[in-house]
Regions:
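N-terminal targeting leaders
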Residues: 2-19, 25-205
Length: 205
């Protein structure tokens, strides 16, 4: 994955502000060069995506702004998120056009198994459970109650997003330190029958 693009990823979580709006602004080479209107549009788009009600831990959204054009990137567990994100951004003042490049992940029973097993491994771990919004007990409850239903996922402010496609896992989001990043990768690789794990987590600075 291109490092520049990934560092412009948008994550919906409590630590989002710590990314300092690291959203790609193709019209300028530095924050100082950004116009006020572009900054305002960027903030408004970010808020619009944050408010999507069905954006969960198995999704990941990002965007870039070039004048009045917003390009959406990322992965959607359900196709409805792709269309909902585009509709929400189109309503933002200052947005003239939306290029929707969000990829809808293919339906797969095996991928679902990997998603939930990875979720359980990470968010109930003694070391990483502080990232679970409701703590490890809430994560255990969600895994036990909803994993059996196709298309279900935990919604909310989960900092570590779990993207699974064709048996391969990619971790995206923001963590506090390198130790947490390493541990999350280890927990993802510990899931049975996963073909590989890409650890693209960003360490908070």
């Amino acid at each position: 994955m291109d490092t520049t693009v990934y560092r412009n990823r948008l994550t919906r979580m409590g630590v989002l502000s710590l990314l300092a709006l690291a959203v790609g602004l193709a019209t300028s080479s530095s924050p100082q060069a950004q116009s006020v209107s572009v900054k305002q549009t960027t903030e408004s788009v970010r808020r619009a995506l944050e408010r999507l009600p069905y954006y969960g831990v198995f999704d990941f959204l990002a965007f870039s702004v070039d004048r009045g054009t917003v390009t959406l990137h990322g992965y959607a567990y359900r196709g409805s998120l792709q269309t909902d994100a585009e509709a929400a951004v189109k309503r933002v003042s200052g947005v003239d056009e939306v290029a929707n490049k969000i990829e809808v992940l293919p339906a797969s029973t095996n991928d679902d198994r990997i998603r939930w097993a990875t979720f359980y491994n990470i968010y109930t771990d003694d070391f990483l459970s502080r990232y679970a919004p409701g703590g490890p007990m809430a994560a255990r409850y969600e895994a036990r109650q909803f994993a059996r239903f196709p298309g279900m996922q935990p919604f909310g402010t989960y900092p570590i997003h779990i993207i699974v496609k064709n048996g391969r896992t990619t971790l995206m989001g923001v963590v506090d330190n390198e130790s947490d990043k390493t541990m999350a990768g280890f927990k993802a690789r510990d899931v049975g029958l996963v073909f590989g794990v890409d650890n693209d987590l960003i360490v908070k600075k």
